[in-house]
């Protein structure tokens, strides 16, 4: 009897090792080696309650059908809380299918960390299955999406993917957050943090107190050159301050970025270093009288230690927007 139990335990551990990995585990292989749709990406277990699919590092295109973010879920006593269900209804549905291998519990809430399309356009995939599910976002996210940016994001992704979002309807968040909320639900506690302006002016960071884990949205993008998607939305100094605040939170050990692998305080600090190095380099050449287009190659050279990051070749458009922030500070 004892031998049978040992065999069962070994089989269970083998199953879990295939299906999930811990937050500190090394991911095997390259994301580029995997097929582009969410169905082919593994569901990773980051903590006792948190699961995530690490998305590809490509911009939306026909092959990926727009999938690019890290859809995640928290399993509570009452059911799943989904964070950023992805960039289309199909991505949202695909993520739901993956969660069925963890539990048959329903989805009880959805959170969108900010207004960008790869984080909220998957809402419909959840709403179709759970029509009454509340979708939370910062009040500024809701305001901007309702003012027309939701349709702009849909049209942008549908164009980039050559029609992959043709059957995706817009499902807007309907529960406004301000930041500072402490939400107790299903046996867990969530703390909502809102930096005034970081990756955008709509960001929330979601702290899962019980698991010592924080969802960063796109304030954090691990080994992905920050700001390359929507630099016009960002505050560069604000992003660095938000990252510092997250690192200084002694109750958090694992950070889930909007793109890239899960992080610890060390890798988060490297991202702060990038922003500080970027602004310092731009300021150096600004004080020499250079315009943004004159200094672009020089700044890239100064930041060569980050050149292996995804989308580093697009740093030029980031420099032009960061230049404006430096100019305002030194006018």
PLM regions: where:
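Conserved beta-strand hairpin/beta-sheet module of binuclear metal-dependent hydrolase folds
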Residues: 48-98, 206-216
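Active-site HxH/HxHxD metal-binding segment of metal-dependent hydrolases
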Residues: 97, 101-178, 182, 201, ...
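Bacterial N-terminal signal peptides
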Residues: 8-18
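Metallo-beta-lactamase
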Residues: 79-81, 87-89, 182, 189, ...
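Boundary at the C-terminal end of the N-terminal hydrophobic targeting segment
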Residues: 21-25
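Divalent metal-coordination and catalytic microenvironments
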Residues: 49, 74, 84, 99, ...
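Positively charged n-region of N-terminal signal peptides that target proteins for export
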Residues: 1-8
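Accessory terminal helices/loops
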Residues: 26-33, 248-253, 262-331
């Amino acid at each position: 009897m004892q031998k049978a139990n040992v065999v069962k335990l070994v089989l269970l551990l083998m199953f879990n090792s295939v299906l999930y990995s811990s937050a500190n585990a090394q991911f095997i292989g390259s994301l580029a080696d995997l097929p582009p749709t969410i169905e082919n990406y593994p569901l990773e277990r980051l903590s006792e309650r948190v699961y995530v699919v690490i998305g590809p590092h490509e911009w939306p295109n026909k092959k990926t059908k727009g999938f690019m973010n890290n859809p995640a879920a928290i399993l509570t006593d009452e059911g799943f809380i989904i964070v950023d269900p992805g960039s289309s209804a199909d991505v949202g549905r695909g993520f739901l299918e993956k969660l069925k291998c963890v539990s048959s519990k329903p989805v009880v809430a959805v959170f969108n960390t900010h207004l960008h399309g790869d984080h909220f356009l998957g809402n419909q995939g959840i709403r179709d299955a759970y029509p009454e599910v509340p979708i939370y976002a910062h009040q500024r996210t809701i305001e901007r999406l309702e003012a027309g940016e939701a349709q702009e994001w849909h049209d942008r992704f549908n164009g980039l993917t050559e029609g992959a979002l043709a059957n995706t309807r817009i499902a807007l968040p309907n529960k406004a957050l301000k930041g500072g909320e402490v939400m107790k639900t299903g046996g867990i506690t969530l703390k909502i943090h809102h930096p005034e302006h970081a990756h955008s002016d709509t960001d929330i960071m979601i702290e899962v107190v019980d698991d010592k884990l924080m969802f960063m949205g796109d304030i954090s993008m691990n080994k992905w050159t920050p700001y390359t998607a929507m630099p016009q939305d960002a505050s560069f100094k604000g992003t660095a301050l938000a990252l510092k605040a997250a690192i200084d939170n002694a109750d958090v050990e694992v950070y889930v970025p909007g793109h890239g692998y899960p992080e610890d305080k060390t890798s988060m600090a490297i991202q702060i270093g990038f922003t500080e190095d970027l602004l310092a380099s731009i300021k150096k050449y600004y004080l020499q009288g250079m315009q943004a287009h004159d200094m672009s190659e020089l700044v890239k050279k100064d930041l060569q230690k980050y050149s292996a990051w995804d989308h580093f070749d697009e740093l030029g458009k980031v420099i032009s927007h960061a230049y404006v922030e430096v100019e305002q500070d030194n006018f």
